[in-house]
């Protein structure tokens, strides 16, 4: 199955929407093993941790369908 290409900004928006409301920022980075991964940044450590756990799960699912486009 061919993966659809998405820009980092598009993937960031998808991950942020799937996580939901909160005061955090999502960035997408290349990952040699999975293709790409999401990193969460924010001011509240508990929220960052909660969102990062969710982002890891979401990215694992989305990596099966989307490829990071430069």
Give the role of each language-model region:
Residues 1-27:
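N-terminal acidic leader/helix
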Residues 25, 30-70:
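Detector for the mature cores of small, proteolytically processed
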């Amino acid at each position: 199955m061919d993966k659809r290409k998405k820009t980092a900004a598009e993937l960031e928006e998808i991950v942020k929407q799937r996580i939901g409301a909160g005061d955090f920022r999502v960035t997408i980075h290349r990952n040699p093993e999975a293709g790409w991964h999401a990193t969460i940044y924010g001011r509240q450590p508990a929220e960052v941790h909660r969102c990062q756990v969710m982002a890891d799960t979401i990215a694992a699912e989305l990596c099966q369908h989307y490829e990071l486009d430069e």
